[in-house]
C-alpha cells in the first residue's frame, strides 16, 4: 500500500474520531538526523493514548536519537475507523514525525507489551505493505525486531519477526544500531545482516529454531539450526543509573492514559510472588540513586510542565530511598502544586508518613493488592502480607482523609477453593469497616478482580487456567457477597483472560489462528468495545485449533514452547518454588535476607543494587519537610493573553487546549496562582470553547500570576516558545475588570464547492427565516433547540466563502458554525466535514 498523503492533514483528520491521535508535534521532540546512517521506526501496537503512556518506548526513542548517525521516529496503531479510511484511500502507515512510510526504514522496533495486542501487529504490518511472515519479506523490507514483556514467550508470533530482543533494551539498541550501520557499509544482503544480529547479547533469531510435535500436540523436540545457541539468554541492564535520557520527556498534546512525568526509581522485584512473571524477568532489584531521581524529576517537570510525578517500580514502596526521596520531592514541588503518585504500593510499605507526604498537594490514588482473600492462599502465592497489615493501612488512609481505597484480587490461583472466594468478600467487608473511623464523608472501596493467567518462567507456569465458565461462576459468587452500596466490584472480562491464557503459553501453531482471526475482523482485543470472542472461536474452528489445549496443566518434564528462552533464573528454582507453594513455605526477599539461589546473580556484573540495605523500607524515619514559602502574602497579577491557533493542532478538543496552556505557563516560568482544596488547579480562565477543527486568529485567556511581568514582550516571546506548533501568542496585556464571556464571534467559512443559486438565495433571505430547530442528544435524551436567534448575520465573501456571525452567551446553549451553516443550507455530512472554518474576530455583546 503506497502512501498517497500524510495522515495528519485536513483531508484525513476531520473524518476520524479523536484526531489528536494522529497529529504528533509533541513538545520536546528531539532533533532528528535526517541523514542518519541507521533509521528506526519504533512501533507501539496499540492506540496512541496507550503507546504514549509506555515508558519503555520513550526511553528507547531518546537513547536512539541521542546517538550519532542514528535516527528514530514513532508509529502507533490506528483505530478501526482510521484504518478503514486509510484502506479506502490507499494511505500507507507512516511515522508521526516525518510521515515516512514504515517500509522505508532500516529497522522496525515493535514493542510486545501484552498478548491481546497481537492482531494490532498484523494491522500495522499490513498497512505498511509488509508480508506477515519474516521468511517471505522482500530484500528491501526493513528488519523487524520485537521486544518487551511478551518476548519471554514470543513463539505464537515468532515467525512475524526477523529478531526478538529478550530482556532490557537500553544498551542493546545502541549495539544493534552500530552493528547495522557497519554491516550496511559492507553492502551485505538482508538475510546476512539478520544473522549477524545474534552477536548482540539477548537477540533471538526465530528462524534458527524449529519445533516438532508428538501425536498429543505436545512439543517433541526443538531443533536448533544454523549453529544457533541452544538457549538465548536475556539481556540485563546491570545498573539503572546508566540510563538518564528522559530529562526532556515528550509532552503529548492529545490526552493519554498516563498523562504525567514518570520516573523509574527501581527495576526488578524479589518479593517472590509465585504468579508474577515480572518478578522473574526483571530481577535483580536495581535501584536508582536519590540524586538521579531528584535530577530526573526536576529536569522533567521543568521541561514538561506536568503537574504530577509518578514514581515507577514494580513495588515503589520497596524502594529503599523512598523515605529520603519523597519529602525532598514534596519540598521542591509542593508550592508549584506538583503532586507525587505511587501507583504500585505493597501492603505494609504504605505508611502513615508516606501518606502524609502524598496528600500535601492532592490525594493521588493508590491500589493495594492483597491478591488473595485468605491467609492460606496468600501463603501459597508467597504474598507475605497479613490481614492485619491491610486493615491497618486502610484505617490510616481513611484517617488521613482518603475516601476511596482500591483493592485488587485474583481468582483461579492454584489450590483456590470456594472458601477462598468468600474470604475475599470478608476481607473487603473488614476494610469497609475500617472506614468507620474519622470523618470526611462516606468511605468507598473499589474492588478489581482478574482471572489468574499462568505465565511462562514462573513457579506457576505449569498450572491449569480456569475456563470461562469457572471464572464466571466464581465472580458470580463474589458478586453475591459484595452488595454494600459503598463497595464497587469491577472485573476483567473472563473471555479476554481466556484468550490471553491461550497466547501466553502458546506455540507457533497459533500464528495461523492469529492471521485468520485478523482476517475475520479481530482488532484491538484488549479494548472491551472491540473484543469479540466468537470471532476467535469461529476462526479456531475454521483452522482446527483446540484453544483449551493451551490452558491445560503441564508436566514439569514437558518441553515448553519457551524452554529455549533463558530468563537466567534456573528452572530448578521455579520447581522448588512450586513445591514450596504446596507446603505453604515462605521464601524471603533476597534484598534483605540471604541469597535464595535463583541462579541469576554472578555478583560481579549482575547483582542487586539497593542503596539502604540495613533495614527494609520504609522503616527508616521520614523527615517531614514543609515547602519553603516564598511570601506569606499573596500578590495577584491578572493578564489577558491573546493567541492564534492554526493548522492541524485545531483538531484537538477544548480540554486538551486547556491542558496545553496549563503546561506551557510553568515551562515559560510564568507561575499562576492555584485554587484551594483537595485538587488545586491553576487560576486560568478561557473564552468560549472552539469546536474541534476550527482555527482562530483571535483566541484569549486570562491568568492570575504570582509575580508581575516587567517586560510584556519578553513574556510573550518565552511563552510563545513554550507552545507547540500551531499556537502563537499575539499579545499579553494587563487585565482590568472581568473576562468577556458574552460576545458576537465572526467566522470565515470555506466550502468545498462554489455556492449554488439556491444556497445564495437562502443566505440572502436569512431575515425571513423565523426558526431553525436542531435536535441534540444529551445523556440519552433528545432535546430540541432553535438556533436561529444565535445567528446574528451571514454574508457571502467569495464564490465559496461565507462570513458568519454567531452569538455566544455563557449562560445559554450555543451553536457551532458548522451546525448553523449545515442547518441553514441543508449540507450533507461529508460536506460539513470538509468545511474549513476560521474565527477571525469577536466583539463584546451589548446587553
Model regions: which residues?
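Radical SAM enzyme core and accessory elements
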Residues: 2-29, 36, 40-42, 484-630
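N-terminal [4Fe-4S]-dependent radical SAM core
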Residues: 11-41, 48-49, 206, 212-262, ...
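N-terminal pre-triad scaffold of radical SAM enzymes
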Residues: 42-46, 64, 251-275, 301, ...
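Conserved SAM/AdoMet-binding glycine-rich loop
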Residues: 42-44, 299-406, 410-449, 454
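Glycine-rich beta-alpha loop elements in corrinoid/cobalamin-binding modules
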Residues: 78-223, 459-507, 515-529
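Canonical Radical SAM [4Fe-4S] cluster-binding loop centered on the CxxxCxxC motif
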Residues: 255-291, 597-610
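Short, charge-patterned binding micro-sites
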Residues: 451-459, 672-706
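Core RNA-modification/binding signature centered on pseudouridine synthases
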Residues: 633-636, 657-659, 768-847
Amino acid at each position: 500500500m503506497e502512501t498517497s498523503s500524510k495522515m495528519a492533514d485536513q483531508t484525513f483528520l476531520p473524518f476520524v474520531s479523536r484526531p489528536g491521535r494522529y497529529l504528533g508535534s509533541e513538545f520536546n521532540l528531539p532533533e532528528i538526523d535526517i541523514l542518519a546512517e541507521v533509521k528506526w521506526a519504533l512501533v507501539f501496537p496499540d492506540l496512541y493514548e496507550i503507546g504514549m503512556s509506555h515508558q519503555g518506548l520513550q526511553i528507547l526513542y531518546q537513547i536512539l536519537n541521542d546517538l550519532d548517525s542514528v535516527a528514530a521516529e514513532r508509529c502507533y496503531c490506528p483505530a478501526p475507523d482510521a484504518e478503514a479510511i486509510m484502506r479506502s484511500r490507499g494511505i500507507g502507515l507512516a511515522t508521526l514525525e516525518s510521515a515516512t512510510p514504515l517500509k522505508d526504514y532500516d529497522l522496525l522496533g515493535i514493542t510486545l507489551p501484552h498478548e491481546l495486542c497481537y492482531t494490532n501487529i498484523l494491522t500495522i504490518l499490513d498497512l505498511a505493505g509488509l508480508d506477515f511472515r519474516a521468511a517471505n519479506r522482500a530484500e528491501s523490507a526493513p528488519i523487524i525486531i520485537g521486544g518487551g514483556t511478551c518476548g519471554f514467550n514470543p513463539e505464537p508470533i515468532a515467525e512475524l519477526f526477523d529478531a526478538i530482543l529478550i530482556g532490557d533494551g537500553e544498551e542493546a539498541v545502541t549495539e544493534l544500531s552500530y552493528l547495522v550501520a557497519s554491516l550496511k557499509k559492507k553492502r551485505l544482503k538482508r538475510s546476512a545482516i539478520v544473522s549477524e544480529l545474534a552477536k548482540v547479547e539477548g537477540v533471538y533469531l526465530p528462524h534458527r529454531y524449529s519445533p516438532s510435535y508428538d501425536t498429543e500436540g505436545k512439543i517433541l523436540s526443538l531443533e536448533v539450526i544454523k549453529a544457533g545457541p541452544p538457549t538465548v539468554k536475556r539481556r540485563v541492564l546491570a545498573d539503572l543509573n546508566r540510563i538518564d535520557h528522559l530529562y526532556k520527556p515528550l509532552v503529548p498534546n492529545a490526552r493519554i492514559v498516563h498523562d504525567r512525568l514518570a520516573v523509574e526509581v527501581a527495576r526488578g522485584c524479589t518479593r517472590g510472588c509465585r504468579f508474577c512473571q515480572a518478578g522473574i524477568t526483571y530481577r535483580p532489584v536495581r535501584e536508582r540513586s536519590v540524586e538521579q531521581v531528584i535530577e530526573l524529576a526536576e529536569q522533567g517537570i521543568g521541561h514538561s510542565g506536568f503537574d504530577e510525578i509518578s514514581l515507577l517500580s514494580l513495588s515503589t514502596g520497596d524502594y529503599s530511598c523512598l523515605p529520603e526521596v519523597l519529602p525532598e520531592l514534596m519540598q521542591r514541588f509542593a508550592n508549584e502544586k506538583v503532586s507525587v503518585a505511587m501507583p504500585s504500593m505493597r501492603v505494609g510499605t504504605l505508611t502513615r508518613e508516606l501518606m502524609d507526604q502524598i496528600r500535601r498537594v492532592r490525594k493521588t490514588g493508590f491500589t493495594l493488592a492483597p491478591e488473595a482473600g485468605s491467609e492460606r492462599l496468600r501463603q501459597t502465592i508467597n504474598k507475605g502480607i497479613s490481614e492485619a497489615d491491610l486493615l491497618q493501612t486502610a484505617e490510616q488512609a481513611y484517617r488521613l482523609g482518603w475516601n476511596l481505597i482500591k483493592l485488587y484480587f485474583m481468582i483461579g490461583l492454584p489450590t483456590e477453593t470456594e472458601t477462598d472466594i468468600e474470604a475475599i468478600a470478608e476481607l473487603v467487608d473488614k476494610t469497609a469497616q475500617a472506614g468507620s473511623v474519622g470523618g470526611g464523608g462516606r468511605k468507598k472501596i473499589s474492588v478489581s478482580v482478574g482471572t489468574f493467567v499462568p505465565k511462562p518462567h514462573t513457579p506457576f507456569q505449569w498450572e491449569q487456567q480456569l475456563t470461562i465458565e469457572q471464572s464466571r461462576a466464581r465472580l458470580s459468587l463474589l458478586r453475591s457477597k459484595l452488595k454494600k452500596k459503598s463497595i464497587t466490584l469491577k472485573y476483567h472480562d473472563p473471555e479476554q483472560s481466556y484468550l490471553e491464557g491461550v497466547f501466553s503459553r502458546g506455540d507457533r501453531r497459533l500464528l495461523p489462528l492469529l492471521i485468520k482471526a485478523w482476517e475475520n475482523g479481530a482488532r484491538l482485543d484488549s479494548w472491551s468495545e472491540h473484543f469479540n470472542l466468537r470471532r476467535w472461536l469461529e476462526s479456531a474452528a475454521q483452522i482446527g485449533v483446540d484453544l483449551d489445549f493451551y490452558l491445560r496443566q503441564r508436566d514439569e518434564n514437558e518441553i515448553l514452547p519457551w524452554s529455549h528462552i533463558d530468563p537466567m533464573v534456573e528452572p530448578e528454582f521455579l520447581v522448588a518454588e512450586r513445591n514450596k507453594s504446596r507446603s505453604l513455605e515462605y521464601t524471603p526477599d533476597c534484598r534483605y535476607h540471604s541469597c535464595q539461589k535463583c541462579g541469576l546473580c554472578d555478583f560481579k556484573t549482575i547483582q542487586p543494587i539497593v542503596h539502604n540495605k540495613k533495614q527494609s523500607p520504609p522503616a527508616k524515619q521520614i523527615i517531614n519537610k514543609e515547602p519553603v514559602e516564598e511570601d506569606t502574602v499573596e500578590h495577584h497579577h491578572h493578564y489577558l493573553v491573546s493567541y492564534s491557533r492554526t493548522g492541524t493542532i485545531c483538531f484537538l478538543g477544548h480540554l486538551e487546549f486547556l491542558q496545553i496552556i496549563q503546561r506551557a505557563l510553568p515551562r515559560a516560568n510564568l507561575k499562576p496562582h492555584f485554587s484551594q482544596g483537595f485538587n488545586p488547579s491553576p487560576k486560568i480562565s478561557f473564552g468560549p470553547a472552539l469546536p474541534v477543527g476550527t482555527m482562530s486568529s483571535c483566541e484569549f485567556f486570562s491568568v492570575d500570576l504570582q509575580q508581575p511581568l516587567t517586560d510584556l514582550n519578553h513574556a510573550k516571546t518565552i511563552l510563545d516558545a513554550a507552545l507547540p506548533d500551531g499556537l502563537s501568542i499575539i499579545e499579553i496585556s494587563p487585565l482590568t475588570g472581568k473576562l468577556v464571556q458574552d460576545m458576537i464571534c465572526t467566522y470565515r467559512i470555506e466550502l468545498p464547492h462554489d455556492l449554488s443559486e439556491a444556497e445564495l438565495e437562502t443566505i440572502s433571505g436569512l431575515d425571513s427565516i423565523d426558526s431553525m430547530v436542531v435536535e441534540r442528544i444529551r445523556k440519552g435524551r433528545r432535546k430540541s433547540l432553535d438556533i436561529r436567534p444565535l445567528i446574528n448575520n451571514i454574508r457571502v465573501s467569495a464564490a465559496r466563502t461565507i462570513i458568519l456571525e454567531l452569538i455566544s452567551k455563557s449562560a445559554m446553549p450555543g451553536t457551532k458554525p458548522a451546525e448553523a451553516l449545515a442547518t441553514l443550507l441543508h449540507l450533507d455530512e461529508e460536506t460539513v466535514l470538509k468545511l474549513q472554518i476560521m474565527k477571525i474576530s469577536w466583539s463584546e455583546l451589548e446587553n
